[in-house]
Regions:
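Anion-binding alpha/beta catalytic cores of soluble intermediary-metabolism enzymes, centered on
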Residues: 1-317
Length: 317
């Protein structure tokens, strides 16, 4: 219902997609809608089951889940039907991942309201994916702008609860996870900046008792970590001045506000800690420009490139 169909329509026409075996999962009429908006067309083979897919001569496949039904979805409008369609396509992709039939997932922007209307009971798609893939280890969301990565110790919790979670073990987990993910994306020996919790990294006890010990421990394991950096200057030090390759922060807004200020229109989300690379553009469904062929392809293209690189490198391990 948003800008997703036109973005997928444009992405499939990009030359870099020829470097992978492409399977698009969704309803055919939705892609047709996207093509009508974008003015693009593709040479796709349409199938109704995965078993019908045979990759040869650079073919790209569309796995049609419509089951012969021609559903109509209103542009820029949330609905139970569109939410169900998104959940069905996502769950099918995750099933294929569990069966080791695919190597990565790159999805367009989701509308959380429609997904909830369609039956999603999870707070976000990451937790849905983790449950579906039976993930028991630590997982978290990475955000990427211009190949600069971020991860956080806490995410969608009240700010009043954040200090309770700032523990050495909790800080080590995202540091290790983002370090491994960036190496998989081709960044050797990533320079990891770790944010403080308190103003100027000194008005509190968390830096001394938890954050610094966490940094010291990961450094012993060979991770190139640095900090704690004061939140208010961390993005200038790490991102703008190019002194680091990523930042690990203690809470949501300390990271998101800085990253979005530098590149909200170029952001990519990587789902960290899952058994295969899963990426998406960081923006939403943008109902205000849906259907107008104004959607910027760059975040979607970058998210595809990251998924492709990580999958290629993972296959070499």
């Amino acid at each position: 219902s948003g800008i997703g169909p036109e973005l997928v329509s444009k992405l499939i026409c990009e030359e870099i997609t020829n470097e992978a075996n492409i399977i698009i999962i969704g309803e055919r009429n939705i892609l047709d809608q996207g093509n009508k908006i974008s003015g693009k067309s593709q040479n796709l083979k349409y199938v109704e089951t995965f078993d019908q897919i045979k990759f040869e001569d650079g073919n790209k496949f569309f796995l049609d889940i419509s089951k012969g039904k021609n559903h109509k979805y209103k542009i820029a409008e949330c609905s139970e039907e569109s939410g169900k369609s998104v959940l069905e396509s996502l769950n099918l992709a995750l099933d294929l991942a569990k069966e080791n039939k695919i190597d990565a997932i790159n999805f367009g922007p989701f509308n959380k309201t429609s997904m909830k209307m369609g039956g999603n009971r999870h707070s976000d798609e990451l937790h849905l994916m983790a449950e579906k893939l039976n993930v028991k280890n630590f997982f978290c969301e990475f955000n990427v702008v211009d190949n600069f990565w971020t991860a956080r110790v806490t995410s969608h919790i009240p700010i009043s609860e954040v200090p309770n979670h700032i523990k050495k073990a909790n800080i080590i987990k995202p540091i290790k996870l983002i370090n491994d993910a960036m190496i998989l994306n081709g960044i050797k020996n990533p320079r990891v900046a770790v944010q403080a919790l308190n103003p100027h990294a000194e008005f509190g006890i968390e830096e001394k008792n938890e954050i610094i010990p966490a940094i010291e421990e990961v450094k012993k394991e060979g991770i190139n970590a640095d900090g704690p950096l004061p939140c208010d200057t961390s993005f200038i030090t790490a991102f703008k001045n190019k002194n680091h390759d990523c930042i690990v922060g203690m809470y949501h807004d300390a990271l998101q506000s800085g990253l979005k200020a530098f590149g909200f229109d170029r952001g990519v989300t990587v789902q960290g800690g899952l058994p295969l690379p899963i990426t998406t553009p960081a923006h939403g469904t943008a109902f205000d420009i849906a259907g107008k062929n104004k959607a910027n392809l760059e975040p979607t293209l970058q998210s595809f490139k990251i998924a492709l690189t990580m999958a290629q490198n993972k296959s070499k391990q």
